[in-house]
């Protein structure tokens, strides 16, 4: 299931939405975080997505896709983000514009080969483009505008 989640950052009054994808609720969560960036700087929405991914439990692996000139600097910055246990870097000029067409198949490949249970991205125009296409590639559905996760039980009444 893909979802858009709005999580409150510590000390923030405004909710920062993010997009997430889940393949299973039955096993330990392992999250692939798509890191959005521009000119070598991580988009703040991606940092909010880390906070939400931490609520899922398990490891968080950051995916940095982009041109080689920016991806390395972004990967270094992502490796310093608290909660991120591993950074995956994929460099190609095809990834430089952060378009869904080349990145969604990359996400699909990683989810299938590494058995990620969730994919999370900041709720931005880029996230709204990439995550739904990745859901289609993985034959999954999308759920939008989830505010918070209250329970891990599927049929929870609270």
Model-derived segments and their meaning:
Residues 2-153:
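N-terminal glycine-rich FAD/FM-binding segment characteristic of electron-transfer flavoproteins
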Residues 154-158:
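Positively charged, low-complexity/disordered segments
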């Amino acid at each position: 299931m893909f979802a858009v989640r709005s999580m409150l950052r510590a000390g923030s009054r405004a909710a920062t939405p993010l997009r997430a994808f889940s393949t299973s609720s039955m096993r330990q969560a392992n999250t692939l975080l798509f890191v959005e960036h521009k000119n070598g700087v991580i988009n703040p929405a991606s940092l909010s997505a880390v906070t939400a991914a931490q609520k899922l439990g398990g490891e968080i692996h950051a995916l940095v896709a982009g041109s080689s000139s920016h991806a390395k600097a972004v990967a270094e910055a992502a490796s310093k983000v608290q909660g991120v246990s591993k950074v995956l870097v994929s460099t190609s000029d095809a990834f430089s514009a952060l378009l869904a067409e080349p990145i969604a198949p990359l996400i699909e490949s990683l989810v299938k080969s590494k058995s990620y249970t969730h994919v999370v991205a900041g709720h931005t125009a880029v996230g709204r483009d990439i995550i739904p296409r990745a859901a289609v590639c993985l034959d999954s559905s999308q759920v939008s505008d989830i505010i918070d996760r209250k329970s891990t039980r599927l049929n929870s009444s609270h």
